[in-house]
Regions:
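A generic structural signal for alpha-helix starts
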Residues: 23-26, 105, 223, 251
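Conserved short-loop catalytic and cofactor-binding motifs
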Residues: 68, 102, 159, 219-220, ...
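FMN-binding flavodoxin-like domain, especially the glycine-rich phosphate-binding loop
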Residues: 2-18, 25-31, 37-50, 56-69, ...
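Iron-sulfur cluster-binding cysteine motifs and their immediate structural context
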Residues: 217, 223-245, 249-251, 255-272
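Active-site-proximal loop/hinge segments that shape catalytic or ion-binding/gating pockets
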Residues: 277-285
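A mid-sequence, solvent-exposed acidic-amphipathic segment
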Residues: 190-224, 230
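A short, structure-level motif marking secondary-structure boundaries and short turns
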Residues: 98-100, 212-214, 241
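A generic structured-segment signal
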Residues: 20-21, 232
Length: 286
């Protein structure tokens, strides 16, 4: 399982430094790992926590809370929003909280929406009633992985490398801010019309495009390797050739599409002539 290295909790735990993260094609996982290794934070994989129904965590007095996730349709992914609505942080009292989103070009108002989700969960309020808010916010540009709209494609290899090298340099700066618990730092690439991206296009995206009904597999090409079901973060794929369960849990991360070694999976017809991407696919990204 792609998330097998992340240690899960069997009971309520006292955490020291924690990053909750979700990643579909590996960009956000790599970013979260760079931060965790640099500051000694523990990575908690959101899909694993959802599988195990583990939502309650005890905070230490000086706990630092971090969230890392990709931008999906200029909004936080469905799976991240579902997790936040169930998260319980015992002892939350003005703890330093930061959040980072990865995106192909810009992220619109994804962080505004994310903070609204935090504020709406009363289980995240402090003892005096103040909501948990991510005060320090970052976006990191990473290689594009969304390919289901006419104007969106994967990046050429040279642009992939350029984005990752830029991200690597940016992360040194981000890590120093997190280490020092600097509040109120906002470094976001929102784009030219962020409200249009998130509240109009993004709303349509989440209503119409976040679905498994458009996925299909070419049975003549499928090698029955089972990779697609292994990488699905919501366990929405069974069997070989794969069958999508249509259970409403698909978060449209496109992991099944991108990780298929023979390009047997497609989303409608638009991806048939599109390339695939996941982090370190060719072994040249570390």
């Amino acid at each position: 399982m792609i998330y097998s290295k992340i240690r899960l909790f069997t009971t309520l735990k006292f955490l020291t430094y924690t990053i909750f993260y979700f990643s579909g094609t590996g960009n956000t996982r790599w970013v979260a790992q760079q931060i965790a290794e640099a500051i000694g934070e523990e990575l908690l994989c959101i899909p694993d926590l959802l599988r195990e129904k583990r939502f309650e965590f005890k905070l230490e007095e000086n706990e630092k809370i971090g969230f890392c996730f990709p931008t999906h349709g200029w909004q936080p992914p469905r799976i991240v929003r579902q997790f936040i609505r169930q998260l319980i942080l015992v002892g939350q009292h003005s703890h330093f909280c930061w959040a980072l989103t990865t995106c192909g070009d810009n992220m619109g108002e994804a962080m505004t929406i994310f903070n609204k989700e935090l504020a709406a969960n009363k289980a995240l309020q402090s003892e005096n009633g103040n909501p948990l808010q991510a005060e320090t916010l970052f976006s990191v540009i990473m290689p594009e992985s969304y390919v289901c709209l006419p104007f969106m494609k994967t990046d050429p290899i040279d642009k992939e490398h350029w984005k990752i090298e830029n991200a690597r340099h940016q992360l040194h700066h981000i890590i120093s801010i997190i280490k020092d618990c600097k509040r109120g730092i906002v470094e976001l690439e929102k784009g030219v019309t962020p409200r249009l991206y998130s509240y109009v296009i993004g709303a349509y995206f989440n209503k119409k495009m976040v679905t498994d009904k458009k996925f299909s597999v070419d049975a003549d090409i499928c090698t029955h390797c089972g990779k697609c079901s292994k990488v699905c973060p919501v366990d929405n794929i069974k069997g070989t050739p794969p069958t999508w369960l249509h259970n409403g849990r698909c978060t449209c991360c496109l992991a099944c599409y991108h990780y298929c070694p023979v390009h047997a999976i497609n989303y409608g017809s638009i991806t048939r002539k599109r390339d695939q991407y996941y982090f370190n696919r060719r072994g040249d990204q570390k």
